[in-house]
């Protein structure tokens, strides 16, 4: 099985909250797709709550689009990581990490403005696979923590696992 890009970086040295360009690729038509690692928690030390990350999934995707989409950037998808330490964001374009960090913080401010659970988009049995597994309170707590900490940048060159380590795993 091929080694995926996300497993070639040292998770023990990742900072959080932090933005990282996980991957870039060019489509056959010449568009650049960039995948960002939006790391909310330090891997293996912290984890996002189940209900909190699920509620953020519903809110964050729309709020990030409000702040980042433009004539040069279009978000394709924002999905939670299975390890519950962050989200992957795939988009068309090549925004700088600082711009993504700024938009991420603005999106977290938007989460804090949501007044009640009924304002969470697609919160019903028709549009959500586990519509009862939400917590606006937990999502707001996550947002507050991100805002308080600020968002840094993780660089692949700083996190790359050596060939020697990879061979030993």
UniProtKB/Swiss-Prot annotation:
Fe cation binds at residues 54, 58, 128. Binds 1 Fe cation per subunit. GO terms for biological process: quorum sensing. Involved in the synthesis of autoinducer 2 (AI-2) which is secreted by bacteria and is used to communicate both the cell density and the metabolic potential of the environment. The regulation of gene expression in response to changes in cell density is called quorum sensing. Catalyzes the transformation of S-ribosylhomocysteine (RHC) to homocysteine (HC) and 4,5-dihydroxy-2,3-pentadione (DPD). Belongs to the LuxS family. HAMAP family: LuxS. GO terms for molecular function: iron ion binding; S-ribosylhomocysteine lyase activity. It comes from the Bacteria. Homodimer. Its cofactor is Fe cation. Its EC number is 4.4.1.21. This is S-ribosylhomocysteine lyase. It catalyses: S-(5-deoxy-D-ribos-5-yl)-L-homocysteine = (S)-4,5-dihydroxypentane-2,3-dione + L-homocysteine. PANTHER family: S-RIBOSYLHOMOCYSTEINE LYASE. The keyword Transport does not apply. Keywords: Autoinducer synthesis, Iron, Lyase, Metal-binding, Quorum sensing. It comes from Shewanella loihica (strain ATCC BAA-1088 / PV-4). NCBIfam families: PRK02260.1-2. It is an enzyme of class 4 (lyase). The lineage of its organism: Bacteria, Pseudomonadati, Pseudomonadota, Gammaproteobacteria, Alteromonadales.
